[in-house]
Each structure stands twice: as C-alpha cells, then as structure tokens.
Amino acid sequence: MIFSQGASPLKGDFSKIKFSIASPESILAHSRGEVLKPETINYRTFKPERDGLMCEKIFGPTKDWECYCGKYKRVRYKGIICDRCGVEVTTKSVRRERMGHISLAVPVVHTWFFRSVPSKIGALLDLSTKELERIIYYEVYVVINPGEPGAKQGIKKLDRLTEEQYFQIITEYEDNQDLDDHDSDKFVAKMGGEAIRLLLKSIDLNETAIHLRKVLKESSSEQKRADALKRLKVVEAFRKSYEPQKKTRKKAVGLFPEDELPEPYVFEGNKPEYMVMEVVPVIPPELRPLVPLEGGRFATSDLNDLYRRVIIRNNRLKKLIDIRAPEVILRNEKRMLQEAVDALFDNSRKANAVKTGESNRPLKSLSDALKGKQGRFRQNLLGKRVDYSGRSVIVVGPELKLHECGLPKSMAIELFQPFVIRRLVERGIAKSVKSAKKLIDKKDQVVWDVLEKVIDGRPVLLNRAPTLHRLGIQAFQPVLIEGKAIQIHPLVCTAFNADFDGDQMAVHVPLSQEAQLEAALLMLSSHNLILPQSGKPVTVPSQDMVLGMYYLTKSRPGDPGEGRIFYSDEDVLIAYNEDRIGLHAQIFVHFNGAVDQKFDPLRVLDTIVDPKSEKYTWLKSQLEKKTILLTTVGRVIFNQNVPDSIGFINRVIDKKVAKELIGRLSSDVGNVETAKFLDNIKEVGFHYAMKGGLSVGLSDAIVPDTKVRHIKNAQKDSTKVVKEYNRGTLTDNERYNQIVDVWQKTSNIVAEESYQKLKKDREGFNPLYMMLDSGARGSREQVRQLTGMRGLIARPQKSMSGQPGEIIENPIISNLKEGLTVLEYFISTHGARKGLSDTSLKTADAGYLTRRLHDVAQDVIVTIEDCGTTRGLHVYRNIEEETSGQIKFREKIRGRVAARDIYDTLNNNVIVKAGEIITEELGDLIQETAGVEEAEIRSVLTCESKIGICSKCYGTNLSVHQIVEIGEAVGVIAAQSIGEPGTQLTLRTFHQGGTAQGGISETETKAFYEGQLEFEDLKTVEHSAITEDGVEEIRIIVVQKNGKINIVDPDSGKILKRYVVPHGAHLHCNAKALVKKDQVLFSSEPNSTQIIAELHGRVKFADIEKGVTYKEEVDPQTGFAQHTIINWRSKLRANETREPRVLIIDESGEVRKNYPVPIKSNLYVEDGQKIVPGDIIAKVPRNLDRAGGDITAGLPKVTELFEARIPSDPAIVSEIDGYVSFGSQRRSSKEIKVKNDFGEEKVYYVQVGKHVLANEGDEVKAGDAMTDGAVSPQDILRIQGPNAVQQYLVNEIQKVYQINAGVEINDKHLEVIVRQMLQKVRVEEPGDTELLPGDLIDRSAFVEANNNVAEKVRVTEKGDAPSRIQEGQLYKTRDITKLNRELRKNSKNLVAFEPALQATSHPVLLGITSAALQTESVISAASFQETTKVLTDAAVAGKIDYLAGLKENVIVGKLIPAGTGLKRYRNLTLTGESVETISHDASDDASTQNGI
C-alpha cells in the first residue's frame, strides 16, 4: 500500500487511499533497519536482542524516553540516537508504527499473486498454476532465453526442462556459458522465484495487450478467445495502475524539478516483477507482541514464529551460498525459504500448513489477521471497544418520563468521574485530582450533589444487543437511582425488543459538544416515536397499559348511574370520585367539539333510556344536533389526556386504536405533545389495570357445550370420506385432503364458538376475553388451543415426497384446559421442540442476511435534491390484494413524489400535481376516489443520480413525515428495516406450538361486491351429471385456463373485483347477470387440477401401457381399479421414447383433440369409451402445503430473492408473444414451440414429467410461464427488462413479509436494495472503448466510457499525416478535421477516418453478496468477504478508494459522509446579526458558596 510521505501513514487529512504492489524500494523506504537474527528477547535479561525481531535499534525503545543501554533517560534527550546502543530516544508508541525488513538471499514469489484465482502470474506468463508451482518450488527449469542452443534444439521461451534435459544442453554447449547474460544468443534457463522474476521483467505490457486484443478480434476458436480474455484482464489491470499516476505527474512536473519529484509522483505504476519479492517487510513489534505470563513463560503472536522460520532459513541459505554448497542442497533450502515466506503471508491456503507444537493448530499468518470475524477489519476497525461505558441488568421504571432512564448512582459516578473531579477541583472542594478521587471513594454527600449538577442536561446513550435497527440505541436523560439495575421506560421496550427477564443494556456517555447535541436532538427517545421501516408508531402501549385503557373505556350495561346527563367533564369526574356513578356507566355529557366515534348513539339510546319518556325525546333531538355526547365515565377520564385538537375519542381503546391515535398525534401535534400524551396514558393504563384487578383464573377459560356435537359430526363426515375412498370414487390423495378439510373446518367452528362464549361471559368482562380483545396478550389461536381443540398438527419429518408441510390427519381433539391424552401430548411435543430449535438456528441466518443487506447498501446516501429524471414507477390499485389484507394503494403512494399529474378520471380533475409530495391526507383522498386507478410516482429504482440517490426519488423520511434530507443514509436504514423483521420472521414459528393452520380448501367462490357480471376469455361446455339424490342436472363447466369473471359497477362501468376461474370449475351464474354480495359464482375442486373433454367422440389411449407408463392399483375391499401414470423413463431402452396422452377421435378415426397426461395423474376414462364435453379425462393431484405458519418458507425465500438465485426447478418462460404448439417428443424431453404473427418461432425443451400449463393453440405473452415451477428473476430480466424484474423482486419479497409474518415494510426500502442489485452492466461488444468483452462495470462507468469515445474518430488510412498519427488509433474529431484542412491546403492525401464505435452492454442482476463484493470501494469489499482476493485484485490494478461510503470511513477512522458528517456541513461558519450577553447566574454563585 502506498502512502504519502511522513513519519506515520494515515495521519492528517487525506481523501483517498491507493492500493498497489509494494516495490522493493518502497519496502526499504518504510523500513528502519534489517532484521538479521531470529531471536526475540534475551532469556536472562528479558530485553530485546539486537538485530532480532524485537530489536530496539530498528523498532524503537521499549520504555518511554529511554535507550536500550540506559545512557539516555528522560524526555530532555528527545530525538538523540545513542552512540552506544544505536536506539533513538523517543516514546515507546513508535513500536506500533516502525517497520523493518528481511533481505532475502533469493527472490521469492508472493503467494497471493500466484495462488489467487485466476493466478495473476499465470495469466501474465500464460502458464497453468500446476506448471507455475513446479517452477516456483524448484522442480523444473523454465527457459528464459532459448539463445542459439535453444534454436538448434527447437526449444522456445517458457518451455519447461527437467534437470537431465537442462544439463544435457549445458554440457553440449559449454562455450555458451561464457557469453554475457544479456547476449541474445546465450541459452538461459532457471528455476524458482528468480526465474519468474526475470520472465515477468521481460514482459512488455503494451505489446501483450495489443496481441491479446488481436486474438480476441480475429480468433475463431472459442477456447482461445476465452483464454486471451482472461489474460487480457490481468494485463489491463497492470496497465491501468499507471493511468492515475500520469495525471498526477502532469500536475506535479510544473511544480517541482524533474529529479526532485516527491515520492508519490515518482511511483510509476505496478511492475509485474514486484509480484516476486527480494525484500520481506517486517511489521512493527507491538502488532505481534510477546507478552510475559506468570510462571516465567511467554505468550507470543504466531507471526513471530513465522518470521523466525523465514529468518532462520534465509540465514542458512546465505551461509550455504557462501560455502558454495552443492546445487541439490541449495535448491532444497531455496524451496524451504519459499515455503516459509508463503506460510508467513497466507498459511491457511496451504494443504500442509505450518502448525503449532502443543495444540497442533495452523499458525495465524498475515492474511488470517485480516480475514473473517476475528480479523483486523471486523474485529478492530469496524467494532471497537468503547471507553466511558458500562452495562447492567434492566428493570422497569414506570414512574419515569419517556425521555428519562434510571441510572444507578454507582454506575453514574464511574462514568462521569472525570467531570465530577473537575467540578470538585474547580469549586475548591478538593485541592487536587488525588483528593477528589478520595472524596469520590468515600461516597461523600457533596459528591452526589455535584454528580446531580454534572448529569443535568447531559444525555446518555442506552444500547441493547442485538442492535438490529437504529432504535436499538437511544438517548435518555439520566435520573440517579439507588440499586444496581438500570431503569427504562416501559414504552421504549418495543423499540429495543427488551423485556425484564434478565436482559442487559449498555450505557455510553457522549463526550464532545457535537455528540451531546446530536444525542439530544436526534437520538432522544421522545424524538423516536415512529418506526423508520413503515412510518407507524413504535412507542405503543402494550400489555398492562392496553388492558387498563381497554377496561377503562369499555361500557357495561346497567352500571350505577347509567343514563344520567352531565353538564361538563368536571361534573362527571366529581360524581365518579364521590362514588355516585360506575366507571363503565353509559352517560350523556354536553359537548360541542370534534368527536371520533364508530357507532350510532341513536341506535343504542332506547337500551339506556325508556323510549316513551320525555327524556328520550329530548336526548334524541340533542344527539341529532350533536350538542350532547353518549359516552362512558371511563372515556371521559381517558379523554382528559387527549389534546383538544384531536377531539373526543369516543371508542373502546384497544391496541389498534391506541396505535392509530399515536400516529395521528405525532403527525398533527408533534413529538413533544405526543410524548406527554404517552406518559399520561401509561399512568392511566397501569392505574386501571390495577384497579380492575384483571388476572386470569382457570375458570375464565370456558369450553363451549357444543364441542362434543361438532366432533361427532366431524367423525361421521370423515367416516363417509373413507367409505367413498373404499368404493373407489376418491383417490388416496383426495381422501387425505378431504379428511384434513373436515377437521380443519370443525376446529375453526369450535374455536369460533369458544370465542363467542368468552365474549358473552360476564357481559364481556371476562379477563381472558379482555386480554385477547384488547390486543394486550394472546391471540385467537391460543384461545382455540385453551378452550376449543388443539386441532391438526404438522407431521414431524419431511414426507417421502419431500413435502415438508404434511399434516397428521388425526387431530388433537382435547384442549389444554381439559388436558391431553398421552398420545396427543406426545404428538404435540414435536411442534413445541421444533419451534425452539428453529428459532436458534434461524436467528443466525437472519443476522447474516442483515449483514449482507447492510454491506450492499451502505453507500446509498441522499446526495442531491433532484436528479431531474422524467421516469417514474406505475402503481396500480389492486382490489384483490386490498381485500386479502395486503398493502393498500394508499400505502404504496403515500410519502412519494408524483412523477406525473394524478387524475380523477370520473370527475376529470387533478388531485396531485407532478412534483408534489403525496401526503397522508392526499393518500387517503386518492384511496377513496374511485376514479384514480393508477399513479406514476418517483422511485429510487428510476433515480438517475450518479452518486447515491436524490431526495425527490426517495420521497419522505418515514420517521418524520417530511421530505428526506440530503445526507440521510437511506441504504443503512433500508438494510435495517428489512433485516430487523427478518429475525422476527424467524421467531414466529414456535408461538403456534407446531399446530397446522393452513387455509381450508374453499370449494365455493362468492361475490365480494354487488354488481353486474362480465365474462372475459371464458370458454364453457354444458354437461349433464347425476347428483347424489339420483337427479340429472345440467352443469356449466369451464374448459379454458385463466378465464376471468369481473364484477362491474353497473353505473360507472368500473371493475370492482376480478376472479380467475380455474380450469374445470362449475359455474353458478350467467354473463351480464346482476349478483348480490356473497352469492356463489363458481365452485371448483381445490385438491386437484382436472383435464376436461371439450368435444364429443371416443377415447383412444396413446403410449398408455400397463406396467410401462401406468400402474393399476386395485382396492382389496372394493375391487375398484385406479389407473395412475408413472415415471416411465427408467423402464425404456436407450433412444426409446413415450408420451402418454389421451386422444379424442371421431367416427372416422381422425384425431380431434390431443390431451397429454402428466406423471402422477389419475385416469378417469377407459380406452374406447364414448365421451361428451365436460367429462373428466384425468385429475392431476395438487400437493397442498397446508402446514402454513412455519417461516421455513419465509427466510430462505427472502434470501433466494435477494441473492437472485435461479430456483431449483424453474418454470419455462416464453420469450415472445405468440401461440403454443407441441413439437416432437424425445426420450427425456418434449418440444414446446411458440410462434408469433411475424413468423418468429422459439423452441423450448421440457423435461418429461414436468406439468405443462399451456395447451395446444393457447395464446401466451412474453414472460408467461408455460410449465409449473417458480419463475427465475434472471428470465424476467432477459425477457421483460430491468423494470419488470425490479417490480417482481419488490412484490415477491413484500409477499413473504406480509403473508408469513404480517410485517409491514415500506416499498422504498426494498427498492433501495433492488436498485443496488441492478447497478452493474456486462459489456457485450467493447467497440473502440478501453472496456473488455464480459467486463462487469457500473452503469455510470459504462456511460462515461462511451462518452469518452463519442467525440472521437478512428483513423483507417493515415494519408500524408505526420508520424504521430497512427492507423487504428483514436483521435478527437476536431483535431483530425483541422489536420485534414491543412493537408487539403497543401494538396496532400487526407486522413481517412470513421466514427469511433461505442460499446454495447446488457443489464446484470447480481445477488446481494456479489453486489457487495463488486462495490467500487476496495476497503468496503475487503471487510465484507474474500479479503485476500479483493486486496490482491485492487493492488494489481492500482485501485484508488475515494472513501465515498460509510464503511470505509469508519475503518480509516474518519467521520462518515452522511448526516452531520457530510462535507458540506464540516466547515460551516456561523454569522449573527447581534450578540446577546447572558447574565451571570446568581444561583450558580450561591451553590458555589454552599460548597457544591
């Protein structure tokens, strides 16, 4: 690594770091002396040996201001070099920065450049790693110059020779050895590092590059081109390392005389021979310490051992050379030296790594010190230990304010000790620091008074590990408390994910003024009420507080004082305090403000007041005028805490309402008022939870009486299913699915009834029901298990078919109150254990996902206000998604900037203008306006900012509801927002105790709205069938795939809902008919896909042979035979093929229709049978994964999407719009052809047995899946382009988070990550740019490369141009035009030229791991993964890290370029109009006099 000159690298201000291969000169320039001896310290004196690995002369003194021999002591001799021992008198800290060196007897190859993949040395010399290894380890000679003997023998440069061949040539041509080494006729062959060095030195990089480019252009062999490209990449990397230097040299030459250029400008770029070392640097001794242990033993760093081996072998080799030892011995010693240096640099790569004596573990080399979690980057540079910090157990502090935390006095005095000491000395209470310390140790009362003063207004930071998102560290104002535990406010527990079962927290003290200011303004807990991931409140009351508020605001019919009328709130409170009215009594209060209520008071009025009385009439008129309010006493008490601007909240307050209310408050009245409100409702909640005496007893869990009846019915139904199976009308798969259905329905009915029973118990005041209904604790699922029945349980191991989610078909009938039988208990233990083990395994996965996300997005910062793009993202209203509880249209557009005007098409007016922010209110308005079907919004995905992103494309900062500020680290926030719920996603499994909760297979689909029906692409046939009662009925059967039924609003013609009708469904309605809500539209069989006949005719089997392509299973009880298609490939001979299909033929025997039948399908027709439209030909069973709830699908699915992996069994996707036809059948695959109207045809080969979704003649669009399986994101990118794949990834990841965990993450966070995955392009044709085919580069770098050649031309014929103009080279258009003008004037031949060709490329979708490794920053990539590879590549290419991201700045110890650390904010000067003088505080004087 090359640093600017100076005593210590990296001191002072620097803006970039350059990586390059260290030349022998630069190693010597950094060295303070040569290490000659392997010794470290003297065994008697324990002082460092001279010229050894710890030598004071080379590395500096071991004691401050004292030389080795003791002649010079004390600071006054600073800088003097002792004439006796040669040690400079200075501080011992120099032993952390001074380096030494070892001069090697023979050159040694650096293992990084030789063993990296692809090998850098191998690529330059065109040698394989194996051949290189043989040369480097002295096994064969390599020809460096064939000379005259070589020419005669037919030997070329780089040929390998054995020892015999070498000596044969040497003896044959003895005179040859007398020639000078530089003579071209001399035959030279060598081995080892020396040979490699000479070969590398002889390489002309420019010539090699020209030659390789020529091969690339002209060679027809694919292999040759691939090899040339691999080599060219390394050659170009070396050539690039010269480029930045040329520019800096140009600048410098004018400033300094040529021979006095400073070191950075002398650097000429990387020379290939630098990869072979003549000098090995020795790192400072303090970085490889030797530590004395008790008992006179020493602990040493492994590096000392490795250096010792190098020095011993090097010294031995020097001796052997001096005494002219035989070649064999020398060669062996040289090989051992090479191995010793290899081990020093990278010991883990070697198969026979050097191991320690005692524990037999491999020694940690220099590479290991950088790599991995314990390496230098992650252990010391990214995660440092912090002073002024402490940790302790946390307990709840219910009396604290939201911005406060309770800090134990003993901790506070330790943390703030220096400040207390200073204050004690300043005020004359203590004479010196020592006496102040004594006072503190005595715990004098005055110390506590001073401490109170010191901490006043000084926030502290509290952190709970794991810090998954930024709310894991918050600032609080400390309050001194007795005891040893930190107290925290109950409302911040959610943000920290803390509970009080032994959790610990760390305290940090911000020291500088800036740090204190940022902590107080940005990190104070009362300023962090909103979750950055979704914009929803995070400080929401939970558990007791929710229960207390719910109890307080609930009404109870017949409570004392019901129906009384009060003039004001005060009157109500007085009456309640005097015990005249009950807490839950429904009363009337005069009120004129805004009211938030969801019920109609007129409907319940007659239950409170006699309808015949005058009071009723008067109250009714007042309620209609809205001058009086029907509410409860509790709600009046609750509303004392609600700000007036919000109005009167006349609702039962459960968790959901509380969350909504806090959200409204934070956006309407700001954080200060909201924090006050939160503190007040915390008090109220705890108070009334206590007053209500709400606790759970066994009698509160009530089992419904109807449970026994429902279970009997279910047992009857399942017996009926088994009978049908025995009769042969059902397959085993259908039997299983139907039995599971029966029990799932029963389980749900019992659960619902037990819930209703709880609801009615004690007029809704059953504690268990209140806890559940208020959202304080528990779920319906838990009530079902407590009082209903535990239901179906997922099967432990994966089933034979590899389906993880199979269900045991015998349910657990008991519930937890009644108790389980032994067998039931045994079955249910599995789920509980699996939950716990899953949790621990998956937490690590989620953490690793977070780390990768953070690494890929850490440099995404808001850099400019507006990038000026005209592109945007189209967001559509999807009613189906909204009704199924997914994200609403409003959520997708809220907080974004409109890219185009948003119109209401029905009323033809603009709701939002382009460039405006869609606020909360506008979002609600758009959601409710039926005329807005879509909106085009600015998005991170379409942002055209070159560095980072712009604030217009990002939209609002979700945690403050305002447009994002420049400098916001949105990449880190995105990574945290996705990673934090990732762990929650994981921790969900065991809450269900492994019970199966899959969706009940609903066979009937009902209308969601009233409206008129419209059929779209719906092809049907009529079919007569005999019902169970023996009556014939005509059914309408759907025979088209993907047909749709739309419900349309008859007035506006707007589609309200769209249903996709499955193939084989039975229609219950007609086109254009008017339907009511919940009317049945169609019914379908959910457990199988049906193949339905569309024509009259006769069945003919093709390739359906018993024992070959189908098996016959006869049920022993019924005698009924079931025909199932089997996987027949193994039964055939080579080149033999089959394609089982059912043909429908007419009377003449001509084939009318062809139906391929996939493997595992069950046939429902016989060969030769007559068939009518609507008959079932076959059923393909669906494997329903019913076990649902387990996240096993969740986290791996998210990882698969973020890593852009190709699914294990991807669907085959059409690349063009067109019509499907089937081609020929092969042994293991069949052809599907798609042909469009322009005659273009694409052919796809589908594996036999894969279910084909498309039928002959079907129309498909580009991107449609034609077979089952997941669609690969790479296919979407290739066929539909980057926009489609971005949308696909965002939507798919959202689905996993919402469906599996119900977690809400704003789209913009996913967009930030997906944008990073598509930042790179792959060069296809480089044109005349300097790019290489197959290069993976940043999109902006690609555009820049093309812009560089846009103004240039390539000379095809130079004419009479001067010699500086070369054919095939690029020149600026204006220069050549000017030259041609001059040539024309002089009647000379003009220069012929053509425009320079631009490069072409295609976008590449990278997974987050590879995207993080491909980042522009070397330091960031190196600290992520594959450290040695990243550093090797960077050094070869002479890369410069411009320190643009966050991570690299943390590593080099600079302020991060985000937030207040942005360059533009660094050197602000404040100018003020007037200066205000602040009077001296008299109270401070008084306190001084009192001795504080």
Curated annotation (Swiss-Prot):
Catalyzes what?
A: RNA(n) + a ribonucleoside 5'-triphosphate = RNA(n+1) + diphosphate
Q: What is this protein called?
A: DNA-directed RNA polymerase subunit beta'
List, alphabetically, the GO terms of the cellular component aspect: DNA-directed RNA polymerase complex
Give the binding site residues for Mg(2+). Answer: 499, 501, 503
Enzyme Commission number(s) from the entry = 2.7.7.6
Annotated TM spans? none
The UniProt keyword set, sorted, is: DNA-directed RNA polymerase, Magnesium, Metal-binding, Nucleotidyltransferase, Transcription, Transferase, Zinc
